[in-house]
Amino acid sequence: AIALLGVISSKDVRDTPASVLVDHLNNTPQSDSELYTEYIMNPRVALEFLTPYKSFFATNVDPAFAKQAKDDPQVLVQWVKDSISINNALNPQRISIMPIGVWKARVADINSRDIFFVALARSLGIPARIEPVARKVQYNKEGQWVDVDFEAAAPVNTKYGKVVASYTPIKAL
C-alpha cells in the first residue's frame, strides 16, 4: 500500500476515493519487474478521472487471452486495433472515457483508446505508459520500451541515442 501511495501524486491521494486505490492494490497482478510500481500498479495513466477498473478487467478478460497478451503484448495491440473503433466526433470536449466504458462500448476517441490500452495492459501485468514527452503509447518488453502504433502492421522499437555536449570557456572581455 505504501508503494501505491508513493507513486501517485499528493493530489490523487487527497482526491481519489479509497475504494479506487483498494481496487488497484488488490487486483494488480504481482510482478518482480522493477517497473511494477510505476507502470503496472499505478492507476494514473494520463489526466483521466481515476476509476476502479482492475477488478472489472480481472473478471471480464479471458484468462487464456490475458496470458497470451502478457507473453506477447503485440497480441493486445492487435486486439485493440481490431476491437475498438475510433470516433473522435463523439467526444468534442475531449473528456477521457473511462477504461470500463471503452471496453463496454468498443468505441473511443484516440486519447481514450490510448488510456484504455495502458489501463488494460497494466491490469494484465504488462508495464505500459503514455510517454510523457512525445505522448507515445508504449509497453515494456524485456527491459525495452516498444512504441505502440495502432496504424502500423508491426511494433516499433524505440530508438535510443546519445547526445554529447561540450563547452570550451572563453575569456570575457
Task: Annotate each predicted stretch with a short phrase.
Residues 1-89, 101-102, 112, 122-130, ...:
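N-terminal accessory/pre-domain segments preceding catalytic cores
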Residues 92-99:
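Short, conserved phosphate-binding/catalytic loop or strand-edge motifs used
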Residues 93, 107, 126, 133-136, ...:
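An acidic- and aromatic-residue-enriched active-site/binding cleft used to recognize and process polar
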Residues 99-107:
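Conserved short loop/turn motifs at secondary-structure junctions
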